[in-house]
């Protein structure tokens, strides 16, 4: 017990010392060249952050929703031995809800990439 406690104490102490050194060491000598952004040897003219299209975010969110649908539907076949009708009801409910959401998004024009 004492050996385990000693190993935990030593490893915690070494980790803390290394974290403190890694935090304070770069702050001792800040170099302006290292702090400036690098764009292929040219001085940066504008902001490095370009705005994204709202269409891109909408398609990304739709992708995440359908990815979540797959994650919810994959374990359902293993639940058939408990109650097959309940499993089918859950699967149809998930699919119908996502289909209704997709149709709504389609009718609102959210899937059109070009305006």
UniProtKB/Swiss-Prot annotation:
Transmembrane regions listed in the UniProt entry: 3-23, 56-76, 84-104
EC number: 7.1.1.2
Keyword line: Electron transport, Membrane, Mitochondrion, NAD, Respiratory chain, Translocase, Transmembrane, Transmembrane helix, Transport, Ubiquinone
Catalysis performed (reactions): a ubiquinone + NADH + 5 H(+)(in) = a ubiquinol + NAD(+) + 4 H(+)(out)
Pfam families assigned: Oxidored_q4
GO MF term list: NADH dehydrogenase (ubiquinone) activity
Compartments it resides in: Mitochondrion membrane
Transmembrane helix in keyword set: yes
Keyword Secreted found: no
GO CC annotation: mitochondrial membrane; NADH dehydrogenase complex
Disulfide bridge positions per record: none
Membrane topology qualifier: Multi-pass membrane protein
Function comment: Core subunit of the mitochondrial membrane respiratory chain NADH dehydrogenase (Complex I) that is believed to belong to the minimal assembly required for catalysis. Complex I functions in the transfer of electrons from NADH to the respiratory chain. The immediate electron acceptor for the enzyme is believed to be ubiquinone.
Protein name: NADH-ubiquinone oxidoreductase chain 3
């Amino acid at each position: 017990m004492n050996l385990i406690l000693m190993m935990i104490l030593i490893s915690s102490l070494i980790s803390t010392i290394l974290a403190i050194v890694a935090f304070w060491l770069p702050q001792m000598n800040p170099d302006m060249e290292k702090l400036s952004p690098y764009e292929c040897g040219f001085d940066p003219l504008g902001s490095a952050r370009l705005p994204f299209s709202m269409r891109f975010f909408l398609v990304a969110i739709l992708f995440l929703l359908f990815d979540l649908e797959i994650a919810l539907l994959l374990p359902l076949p293993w639940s058939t031995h408990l109650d097959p009708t309940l499993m089918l009801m859950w699967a149809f409910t998930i699919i119908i809800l996502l289909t209704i959401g997709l149709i709504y998004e389609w009718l609102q024009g959210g899937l059109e990439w070009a305006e």
